[in-house]
Every structure is written in structure tokens, then in C-alpha cells.
Amino acid sequence: MNNIYQKDLGLQQYTKVFEDMLEFTSTRTPETNDEIWLVEHPAVFTQGKHGKPEHILNSHNIPIVATDRGGQVTYHGPGQAVIYFLLDIKRNKLGAKKLVTTVEQACINMLDKYYNLKAHIIDGAHGIYINNQKIASLGLRIKQGKSYHGIAINTNMDLTPFSYINPCGYSGLKMCQLANFYQEADIKKVQQQYTAEFVTLLNNSI
């Protein structure tokens, strides 16, 4: 069983957490414990490493940050449960594809187990959907066998800024959030519930 430290970072600027992820990943050793970071960000658009500027329709003065994760542009804001995975994927016997599958399946399991919601994936469009509306976005980076970045689960937030972009590069993609189904949706609970499901899947795969 893998020892994974959880860190609840609270509300943090995206750029600060991004820099911290880079530093953690570049300085870790084979003995460094894996970590999962739980965080919430002030309003920000983040652009993937191959992101196309035309997918940002109108930023409405929301900051735009270029990152090195996979995927296109997405939005982070208050009320969104963000979970970052700082893992040694070789030690966890994970390839890139298996890591993505585990991240996605943990979200599907969580929504089913705790909220009785039947979520699904769409081939070729990473993320988690309910009735073809996207509830969770993911973007990961693996560098020298170490992962960082993660998943963002729309929980109880203002979804309006998603209309300012083509989310994940898809024009007209409809977004949803847990609060559409459960008014009292709470990001702290979602982060803990998700992490429990993820760690269970991870340990079962080792």
C-alpha cells in the first residue's frame, strides 16, 4: 500500500500552486512520498501546453495562465474542487493511460457512491460527463516518471466564465456542476470523497 500525503491548501492563486508543483516535482527523490493536493483557486483561465488562443473567446479580464499540462483552455474558480496528483508513476506501476483512467474512474465512482449520479466518459474528450454535460475536467503532465496537475470537479460555483471560452477546445460544450443535483454540494467533502476513491483504486492496482 502506497503512503500518500494529503495537503489541504485552501484558496490559493493558481500561479503559486503551479510553481510549487514544478518545484516539488523537480526536487523529489525516489524516496519522496507521493502527495495529493486539495485546493480551490480564484477565477483564472489556464491554457494547456498545446492550447489555441482562439478558444478564449473573451476573457472578461479574468487572468490567463499558460501551463505545461495537457489539454486546451479551462476555467478554475471558487466553488470548484481541484485535486492535484504528485505521484511517482513508476513506483505506482502506472503508465500515462492507466493514470488518466484511474483519475476518471475515481470521479465516476465518487459520483455514484455518494450522490447516486451516473457519470460517464466520452471517447476522445477526456473528462467526466453527466448526460453529456461536463462536470469534471482533467489535465496531467508526466515528467521523468513523475506526475503533476490533476482534476477539477465543478461543485458549487458560478459556471458563467465557461461561456467565455471553448472549454477544453470544444465549442458549445455544456458544463454542469454537483450543485445542479445537490444544492448543498461542498467542495471539502467532494475533495475528501474523491481522494478516498482515487487512493482505493490506486492501491488495488499496485
Curated annotation (Swiss-Prot):
One Gene Ontology term from the biological process aspect of the record: protein modification process
Residues annotated as the enzyme's active site: C168 (acyl-thioester intermediate)
Domain of life of the organism encoding this protein: Bacteria
Binding positions (substrate): R69, G70, G71, Q72, V73, T74, Y75, H76, S137, L138, G139, G150, I151, A152
InterPro entries: aa-tRNA-synth_II/BPL/LPL, BPL_LPL_catalytic, Octanoyltransferase, Octanoyltransferase_CS
Cellular-component GO terms for this entry: cytoplasm
Site (Lowers pKa of active site Cys): K134
Enzyme class, broadest EC rank: transferase
The family this protein is said to belong to: Belongs to the LipB family.
Protein name: Octanoyltransferase
Gene: lipB
